[in-house]
């Protein structure tokens, strides 16, 4: 259940959840250099069960690709023993480092997902699909995020500071310039895109949908315009927030 927020699991087909298991859990043995290690899934929340559950098992023979993941719905997995689970050394993993690791883990979903979207559907459709998804996500999560960083809804200045706060949280630099009822945000660095290599510029349009959606929830009388893009060679990425011309 931890993967999906609220009732989102209701919209996830079984095949999508199984694809994640095939691409991740089933390949842990390969990644660890142990071809006998496979994963047994005993439950999935998307199938109406108590949640994603299962266990890793070392078999007596090397597993073929189709054997690395097995489904045994209804089987009771071994109880979790917290005392036996690996523990991070506190001296090497202080709280600040753990917070950054969790942040980077979350970013990795988008960092790896957007290029795959372009591979599967092509750059133009990836921009459309990603942007629409981003707008919905941005709009849905704006209220909760804004409350956590103490941003009040309404006004260009407030949303500019919202964008800057999230940029700083991602490890980038950001500045805000407010002029009357308009505001500009300049963001240096795009941590999310590090390691992308040569990727189509349409991926930026997909990612930018998050900000468009958040702005709709913040103040629907405002519009967001991109005025510079670091991924296209500009020194930084900039946005202008102003009252809509419509």
Per-segment meaning from a language model:
Residues 4-20, 30, 34-51, 55-246:
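N-terminal accessory segment detector
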Residues 1:
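Surface-exposed ligand-recognition segments of extracellular binding domains, strongest
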